[in-house]
């Protein structure tokens, strides 16, 4: 197992859940946390602990984004009209790395970040190398022609474990994806339950 996979699956073990729905996740075989004390019985979490866990799980799902970036998304979510929890999810799903992953251009959220950093993605015909770039409705995301035969892309095309959500119009032949609308929480194909309202409570306390 590579160091990247070890770090990724450490999040799974800490949460005690297979948060990306991957077949090779270690929690498919055991349900305790990482480290020598991982097998100790865990007591009931306090309200604070439950909220913190919800935040860690959602942050981890989006390739363990930094606290600074995550808090900035929370602040923006609370300033928008409507439900702040729904807004939080909608903003996270507008990240370029999330869309590259959802479109199945790459096999993992971590790979999406690396793929974008290395300049393999264009938005509306222009190269964008910022994973947190905020995609707008109607934007077209594509894999650069020179990058379409990379192993990561070919691997992702063969994955049967996740479907492309309805808020993306994807052409796998051309390796393009159009962002058609901002999704609600119920439309996002999380393999495990996410609780954005607990995250809003965590930061609001």
Swiss-Prot record:
Keywords, in A-Z order: Ribonucleoprotein, Ribosomal protein, RNA-binding, rRNA-binding
GO CC annotations on file: small ribosomal subunit
Domain S4 RNA-binding residue range list: 94-157
Top-level taxonomic group: Bacteria
GO terms, biological process: ribosomal small subunit biogenesis; translation
Annotated SUPFAM superfamilies: Alpha-L RNA-binding motif
Matching InterPro entries: Ribosomal_uS4, Ribosomal_uS4_bac-type, Ribosomal_uS4_CS, Ribosomal_uS4_N, S4_RNA-bd, S4_RNA-bd_sf
Pfam families: Ribosomal_S4, S4
Gene3D superfamilies: Ribosomal Protein S4 Delta 41, Chain A, domain 1, RNA-binding S4 domain
GO molecular function: rRNA binding; structural constituent of ribosome
Annotated region described as Disordered, given as residue ranges: 18-49
UniProt entry tagged with the keyword Ribosomal protein: yes
General function of this protein: One of the primary rRNA binding proteins, it binds directly to 16S rRNA where it nucleates assembly of the body of the 30S subunit.
NCBIfam families: PRK05327.1, rpsD_bact
Subunit field text: Part of the 30S ribosomal subunit. Contacts protein S5. The interaction surface between S4 and S5 is involved in control of translational fidelity.
Similarity comment text for this entry: Belongs to the universal ribosomal protein uS4 family.
Name listed for the protein in its UniProt record: Small ribosomal subunit protein uS4
Name of the gene encoding the protein in the UniProt record: rpsD
């Amino acid at each position: 197992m590579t160091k990247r996979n070890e770090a990724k699956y450490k999040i799974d073990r800490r949460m005690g859940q297979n948060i990306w729905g991957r077949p090779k996740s270690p929690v498919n075989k055991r349900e305790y946390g990482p480290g020598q004390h991982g097998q100790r019985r865990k007591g009931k979490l306090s309200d604070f602990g439950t909220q913190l866990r919800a935040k860690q799980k959602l942050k981890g799902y989006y390739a363990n984004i930094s606290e600074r970036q995550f808090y900035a998304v929370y602040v923006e979510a609370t300033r928008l009209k409507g439900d702040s929890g729904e807004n939080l999810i909608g903003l996270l799903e507008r990240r370029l790395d999330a869309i590259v992953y959802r479109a199945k251009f790459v096999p993992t959220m971590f790979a999406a970040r690396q793929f974008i950093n290395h300049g393999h993605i264009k938005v509306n015909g222009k190269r964008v190398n910022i994973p947190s770039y905020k995609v707008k409705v109607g934007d077209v995301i594509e894999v650069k022609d020179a990058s379409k035969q990379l192993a990561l892309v070919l691997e992702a095309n063969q994955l049967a474990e996740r479907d492309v959500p309805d808020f993306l119009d994807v052409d796998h032949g051309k390796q393009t994806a159009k962002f058609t609308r901002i999704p609600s929480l119920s439309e996002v194909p999380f393999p495990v339950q996410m609780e954005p309202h607990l995250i809003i409570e965590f930061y609001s306390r």
